[in-house]
């Protein structure tokens, strides 16, 4: 738009300056021109003109030129773009390849102004849980007082422990695979180990916000117990507790009822500190039937081991840490559970502090966190749990496709490092040939040293790589603590230098605001397009920070969806969204914008040539109605239709060759070089439109209105044929739009010239019946299209880009399919 404004100023300045020169050369003759004549024609007095001098007239001419040539600024383009985006959004929503069969949810387009950005994405920032994984947690193993219990049996429907309530058998709705040794220990065991095991599963049954719901079945004597809650992790842990004989059957704001192997026990809820991303743990204070008060705490190992009293059982702590490493190495999500028995004095002190903090008007959240920190200390380690969260269908293939498309995928997760690395290998984010750069620091100094070492490694590997084939792939793995030190000490530039040199970045144990900080790190320092995708409330800040935000409609509510630009059901839908629709949208929108520049510039240059041959008076032979209708009726509809329906490549080709996505990243369809080319093309075509009829009719008696009608028709036909030459896939709608607009132009010109009160009455009829008129139209089209046709042919045959090569392959494949139909049955190679 800035370039078009410059062209407008140049055109207006040229006309104004030439007008000033003309006025100076004809100063003595201005009296005979009605426009300047102040008095009647009986007295021709030199200098007595109705104007304020040459300077003022030049300024007036410049401003009039702005009004005359303002069509070059495509104001209507913004309306066309919104219509096109709405059409593109419709086809994205209706795409069955992005329909989630499990949730029966279609793709949602919540923002209509960034469709084309989907074709230029360079970085994808993804959450892990619920985004790459199903967020359907299954309890797999437990570490109890330093002993590993991970030998689960088949655990089917019949293995679910049932409880009897008022004569009705109630079974948990979900079964859990159990370890028979752990079950036996809980049922019949004695001693410290059995006590710790029972406390652990009591903690799992009580330290949560789960609500038990009893559902009816076909059998009146049997019912199902469903656990509902915000966190799938909590649901899995409560189902596990039920499978091991500790069934949560009732919860109110004041008490919890747990069935312990057939014995119902009531526990008073004396206090609850809910989970938050800063503490990374939650705790509950319960009053037990034996009148003791216990504090149960569960949370991430990075948070829990700081409050565990390691002097009580150092061997147990060491064994548990070993088990946690083993669990996370196979991709399990881990939690650590602790307990402490509170004295009455400790409880009363906590109760007073809690009541004061909870009723505070200012800083309530910080005060409650402080109260929690004071009570959550000197905990006795009970053990740990391992929960499996399976990958979503098609995630490894999707990440591989994105990598082939030149898109860098960064995973930002709250899981511990070993779990994140294991999932990274499972989803093909990490590969065995990658060199891993691990930054896992517990102090500012060690973090600084790790960053410096990482930069040295990157520079060394760069010097050893002579070409792209010999380049060693790099993966950066960094934890949340290191990010805290980096962001606090303004070492972001070094982190950026390391991160962009890596093919993969894996951030673990990161808080929600750190996720947004990572996205902002790239946005501030590059012009690359970023995309963030997540499913939970902790992903909202990241989604809002990225250029394009995508929400997964999953198990953790709709906060991410509500904050996003687009929403879908599965991570794998990102491939057709970006590689197919993103490519189409960018290609079509880029072409539409340049085409609008071209068609308006062609029309304006015709007006400009006319002004140069009419004494710079800024009159026009083209009627005002045609000037207005040019961008509204004559040429608008074909542009919009092509921008919605045209496809440069098929879906199959775009998915088979992800590298074609790079055209959008390199801005091949919208750049300064193409703008200059279309401006040169518009100048040439305007010369053909103006001068061929002008030279043919200059010695005839034809009036300017008839010539203006010829110019109008010639411009409209020329720009529509130009568009038709660039259409790749024709539909009946495309045919109707392009050829229909030409017919509509003819009808409008005839109707306008048939109204006696309008200028140019009957003008079209004066020339339309002559053979010269039709010959000139043909000549204008042929001469005007020669450069465009030649440039198109030369580019496609001698300088083809990847898109054109793929298009030729499609044509060859289509012709081969026609002669050999059996080829259509072969499997498409998507590797």
Stretch-by-stretch model annotation:
Residues 606-610, 715-722:
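Hydrophobic, membrane-inserted alpha-helices
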Residues 702-714:
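Structural signature of hydrophobic alpha-helical transmembrane segments
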Residues 626, 661-684:
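Membrane-water interface at loop-to-transmembrane-helix junctions
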Residues 23, 640-655:
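Membrane-water interface of transmembrane alpha-helices
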Residues 684-697:
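Alpha-helical transmembrane segments and their membrane-interface junctions
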Residues 1-637, 732-748, 752-831:
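Conserved cytosolic headpiece of P-type ATPases
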Residues 582, 659-671, 697-701, 721-734:
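Alpha-helical transmembrane segments
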Residues 614-621, 694-702:
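Helix-coil boundary and interhelical linker segments in multi-pass alpha-helical membrane proteins
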